[in-house]
Design a protein with these regions (language model features):
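Short pre-active-site segment immediately N-terminal to the catalytic Zn-binding motif
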Residues: 148-166
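Pan-zinc metallopeptidase signature
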Residues: 217, 225-307, 311-314, 318, ...
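Second-shell loop/turn segments in exported
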Residues: 89-100, 153, 161, 198-204
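Auxiliary, metal-adjacent structural segments of Zn-dependent hydrolase domains
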Residues: 84-140
Length: 329
């Protein structure tokens, strides 16, 4: 069992399996349905928009999945879930409190960034924390939210902020155009400074459009008074060891967002005028100088150790997200 589980873990992530099964519409409370689905699902029957390498990876370990799922079902995992896990999860959710006006303000800011464009209907609603360094979002609102993410003491100890997660994940509901993604690829192909840092970010399972979301989350949180300027700087410095070099540039210019302009439109305008091949390093230095004043723009060793991995890493390779040019974590 462990050998097969290790093989599965080396190829796919739990979120991929959860998201695939949620697309089936099958019951998550019926072990037989789960076992049957992963043993027999036809990749060609899936909607074209969700197909990709992540589906092929799941198919490559189908035999191992079938074996492990059958053994879990035979061992009574469904009963364990209902009697031990679900009550704990439900209690954590019921005990969590947030003021309705705070949620309303967050939603208003996200809507403003949408600039009249519709938000992705499959936006993140519920959040899973597999371990302290890997929080990720799932598509299906009927999945659980673990006590770790909501527990105040754990949040203080590991610098986990559920509302930051909430804002960050819901910003992934903003759509970006193919034109902007092409601009991002052109930048990667033609700017050495950006490409070097982007390759490092990808080694963390991030990169791509993640810098846009990091910048937007800090912008929204700062506008709402949830954080101060130092916290903006800290996030830029330590998120994936400071490799998302577009984040401070985007953050610097977000106050120039025009009335009614979408986030996509703003970013395309920014790429046209500021974020151009050969100019990223100078723009990054200017943005960091504005954020940091005289403080150096490289993270200290202590800062890097504190949060080399962001506490709200995303589920990798779920079906293509409108705000990702490639699967991210």
């Amino acid at each position: 069992f462990l050998d097969r589980a290790h093989r599965i873990d080396s190829v796919v992530r739990p979120s991929q399996l959860c998201n695939l099964y949620s697309l089936s519409g099958g019951s998550k409370d019926d072990p037989e349905q789960v076992v049957e689905f992963f043993a027999s699902f036809d990749p060609e029957s899936l909607p074209q928009k969700v197909r990709g390498a992540w589906i092929d990876e799941i198919c490559s370990v189908r035999d191992e999945l079938s074996y492990c799922l059958q053994r879990l079902a035979q061992a009574g995992y469904a009963q364990y879930w209902q009697e031990q896990v679900r009550p704990c999860l439900n209690n954590a959710i019921e005990q969590y409190r947030i003021a309705p006006e705070q949620l309303g303000a967050i939603h208003q800011e996200i809507t403003r960034l949408a600039g009249g464009q519709p938000l992705d209907a499959t936006g993140s609603r519920i959040y899973i924390l597999g371990n302290i360094d890997n929080a990720f979002a799932l598509l299906d609102e009927t999945f659980c939210c673990t006590p770790l993410l909501l527990d105040p003491e754990t949040a203080r100890q590991y610098r986990i902020d559920f509302m930051q997660v909430y804002i960050h994940e819901n910003l992934h509901r903003l759509s970006l155009s193919g034109e902007l993604l092409d601009m991002l690829q052109t930048l990667y192909d033609n700017d050495d400074f950006y490409r070097t840092h982007e390759d490092r970010a990808r080694a963390y399972g991030e990169g791509g459009n993640e810098a846009f979301v990091v910048a937007a989350e800090r912008y929204v949180s700062r506008r709402l008074g949830r954080i101060d300027d130092k916290q903006v700087l800290d996030e830029v410095l330590v998120y994936c060891a400071g490799t998302l070099v577009l984040a401070p540039i985007v953050y610097r210019y977000l106050p120039d967002l025009r009335n009614g302009e979408s986030f996509d439109g703003f970013l395309r305008r920014l790429f046209d005028r500021r974020i151009r091949p050969g100019k990223v390093e100078s723009q990054y230095r200017r943005a960091m100088k504005k954020l940091a004043g005289t403080r150096k723009s490289e993270p200290t060793a202590a800062e890097t150790r504190a949060r080399t991995h962001t506490p709200y890493r995303h589920a990798a390779a779920r079906h293509p997200h409108p705000l990702r040019s490639r699967p991210g974590r």
